[in-house]
């Protein structure tokens, strides 16, 4: 299932951050889950679509697409 949300914050140096979903939950995102070529980063407030999978520490985003 594909969801949409806004990037709550993303640390480009460490390569991870969180996406805020409409239901108020935050989903972990790692740079390796961002689609596209080149340097993979997200900007705070940027809208994205993504799927959710269960990671070792809870839900995490995969197939993240910048909208």
Swiss-Prot record:
GO terms for cellular component: cytoplasm. The keyword Transferase does not apply. CDD domains: CSP_CDS. Coiled coil: none annotated. GO terms for molecular function: DNA binding; nucleic acid binding. PROSITE patterns: CSD_1, CSD_2. SMART domains: CSP. It is found in: Cytoplasm. The keyword Cytoplasm applies. It comes from the Bacteria. Residues 5-64 form the CSD domain. Keywords: Activator, Cytoplasm, DNA-binding, Transcription, Transcription regulation. One of its GO terms (biological process) is regulation of gene expression. Pfam families: CSD. InterPro entries: Cold_shock_CspA, Cold_shock_domain, CSD, CSD_CS, CSP_DNA-bd, NA-bd_OB-fold. Can bind to ATTGG and CCAAT motifs (Y-box motifs) of single-stranded oligonucleotides. Homodimer. This is Cold shock-like protein CspE. It comes from Bacillus cereus (strain ATCC 14579 / DSM 31 / CCUG 7414 / JCM 2152 / NBRC 15305 / NCIMB 9373 / NCTC 2599 / NRRL B-3711). The lineage of its organism: Bacteria, Bacillati, Bacillota, Bacilli, Bacillales.
């Amino acid at each position: 299932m594909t969801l949409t949300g806004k990037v709550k914050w993303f640390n480009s140096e460490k390569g991870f951050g969180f996406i805020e979903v409409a239901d108020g939950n935050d989903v972990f995102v790692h740079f390796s889950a961002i689609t596209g070529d080149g340097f993979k980063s997200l900007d705070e407030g940027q809208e994205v679509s993504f799927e959710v999978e269960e990671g070792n520490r809870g839900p995490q985003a995969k197939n993240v697409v910048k909208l």
